[in-house]
Amino acid sequence: MNAPDQNQTVRATDLTRQFGERVAVDKVSFELHRGEVLGFLGPNGAGKTTTMQMLTGNLAPSAGQVEICGIDMLDRPTDAKARIGYLPETPPLYRDLTVNEFLQLAGRLHRVPKKELATAVESAKQRCGIGDVGQRLIGALSKGYQQRVGIAQAIIHNPDVVILDEPTVGLDPNQIRDIRALIRELGGAHSVILSTHILPEVEQVCNRVQIIHKGKLVFADSLGGVKAFRGRSLMLGLRNAPPIEAIAAVPGVAQVELARGGMFRVQPAPDTDPTDALVQAAWDGKWNLFQLAPAVSSIEDVFVQLTHREEHA
């Protein structure tokens, strides 16, 4: 029997959740290790929030298993949840408390020993850049500072796993930059799951990416793997380009988008490879083909390909 992986902090196995006849999450499996910052992406209604609720122990799965640092969430929920810090999309803040009062309350709720509470509060404040606002009412703080307080309550007990749900929504550009820097810093000491709709944010702060669509995990790789993802998209370069409708009419082509410099992004139809047909059409039509290659993908490219292909099939 293999020894348990001491660096593994989250393990989800065939995680499934049904609501009546509807399957919201369908056999989702993945692992997370120390030092990893995972970007968790999905369209609205894809099952992302349901998955987050199961990971944090707020919703029981219909089937499957969640383990936090080797602790089964269903068998030992209190012990498993003690290893998690969670910031919901709407931070659970008491606006009439000072920052210090709120973090002391959060520490007690997380069962930080009384003799360690003051140190834990100061450490969380310093890490989150709120050391100078401890005596201020939370309701008097800017949204950016309130988000920092929300993250501070999530890490006050020094959890192994930090889960952040849309932490930069509604912030101004400077606040967004600061929160992203904080998330990168958290990734050095914790495992972080970042749920966001802001795709460039994942490229800036995460080293792993997962995409869920219609309840199924459709992509899981490192950030480097995103760029290597060939998917189905092709880049077509023509010096004597015809109307875009002529390219779209080539057998096996499902969609064409104009890029720049005589470049077109071509989306093949399902289970087809239009490469030969495009070359032949370019020759016959004297389109002066100078490039035809798989597109180098961004997170946005991968996201669009994987979450829209069924709708356009």
Model-predicted regions and their roles:
Residues 2-4, 270-313:
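C-terminal coupling/interaction segments
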Residues 7-12, 17-213, 219:
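ABC transporter nucleotide-binding domains
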Residues 34, 132, 240, 268-270, ...:
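Non-catalytic surface loops within mature trypsin-like serine protease
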Residues 129, 252-257, 288-293:
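A short linear hydrophobic-aromatic micro-motif
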Residues 178-269:
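ABC transporter nucleotide-binding domain
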